[in-house]
C-alpha cells in the first residue's frame, strides 16, 4: 500500500463514528465479489471511498437522529445499531427484533427500528475504477 493510500485510509476511517464503523463493517462483511467471495477477504474499512464514508456518516446520523432514543432504550449501542441498520436495510434476514421476546415493549421498539431502517432501501458495495469501494443505492 502506498503512503498516500495509508494516509487516506487512516484519516478517512480513524474518525468514523461508532455507528458508521459498525455500518461499514457490516457492509463489507456481507458483500461479495463477482466470484462470490466476501469482500472483507480482500478489502478493509480503509478501502471505502471518501465519498462513501461521508454518505455512510450522513445516513447513520439521519438514522440516529430519528432513532437513537429507541435503540438506547433497548440496550443497543452505536456500533451494533450501525451494524443492524445495514443488515436490516439490506433485507438480510437479521433484525433489531432478534434478541427480544414477542409481546415485550422491547420487541415493539425493535419493530419500529426495523421499519425505519427498511425505508432506506437496499444498497450494494462494489469496487470502483480506482480500486476503492463505493455503496450504490437503488
Placement of each model-derived feature along the sequence:
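Long, contiguous N-terminal structural blocks used for assembly/anchoring
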Residues: 1-77
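Long, highly charged low-complexity segments enriched in Glu/Asp and Lys/Arg with interspersed Ser/Thr
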Residues: 128-138
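Residue-identity detector for threonine
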Residues: 13, 32, 50-52, 97, ...
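Amphipathic protein-protein interaction modules
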Residues: 57-130
Amino acid at each position: 500500500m502506498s503512503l498516500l493510500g495509508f494516509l487516506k485510509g487512516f484519516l478517512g476511517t480513524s474518525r468514523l463514528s461508532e455507528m458508521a464503523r459498525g455500518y461499514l463493517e457490516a457492509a463489507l462483511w456481507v458483500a461479495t465479489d463477482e466470484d462470490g467471495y466476501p469482500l472483507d477477504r480482500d478489502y478493509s474499512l480503509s478501502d471505502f471511498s471518501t465519498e462513501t464514508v461521508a454518505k455512510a456518516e450522513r445516513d447513520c446520523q439521519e438514522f440516529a437522529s430519528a432513532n437513537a432514543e429507541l435503540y438506547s432504550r433497548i440496550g443497543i449501542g452505536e456500533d451494533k445499531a450501525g451494524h443492524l441498520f445495514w443488515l436490516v436495510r439490506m433485507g438480510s434476514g437479521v433484525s433489531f427484533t432478534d434478541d427480544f421476546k414477542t409481546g415485550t415493549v422491547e420487541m415493539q421498539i425493535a419493530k419500529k427500528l426495523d421499519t425505519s431502517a427498511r425505508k432506506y432501501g437496499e444498497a450494494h458495495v462494489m469496487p470502483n475504477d480506482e480500486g476503492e469501494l463505493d455503496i450504490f443505492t437503488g
